[in-house]
């Protein structure tokens, strides 16, 4: 479940698409996923389990260039390894995260 999605201030050094590792990781309930878009893009962020099944869709929207952070709550997910995937036009990247209970 997404708690909040908000643009954050972008530094001049942030050029190009970039997906950061979620923090904290591992986590029990709440984590933050940050990514940067160099241009206005159609963005989709999903969470999958270790079998590749989509367990949550965090966002599917057009976003302006800049840096963004999503606050993600894993309260409804069991303990385990999950992946978050960011797709923005021609960019696609994924990271692993660990949910503790």
Predicted regions: what they are:
Residues 40, 65-67, 77-81:
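Extracellular Ig-like/FN3 beta-sandwich strand-entry sites
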Residues 37, 62, 74-76:
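Residue-level recognition of secondary-structure-to-loop junctions
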């Amino acid at each position: 479940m997404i708690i909040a999605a908000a643009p954050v201030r972008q530094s001049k050094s942030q050029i190009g698409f970039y997906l950061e590792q979620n923090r904290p990781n591992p986590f029990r309930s709440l984590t933050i996923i940050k990514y940067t878009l160099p241009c206005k893009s159609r963005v989709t962020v999903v969470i999958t389990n270790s079998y590749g099944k989509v367990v949550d869709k965090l966002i599917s929207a057009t976003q302006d260039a800049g840096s963004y952070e999503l606050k993600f709550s894993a309260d409804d997910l069991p303990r385990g390894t999950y992946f978050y995937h960011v797709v923005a036009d021609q960019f696609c990247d994924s990271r692993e995260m660990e949910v503790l209970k």
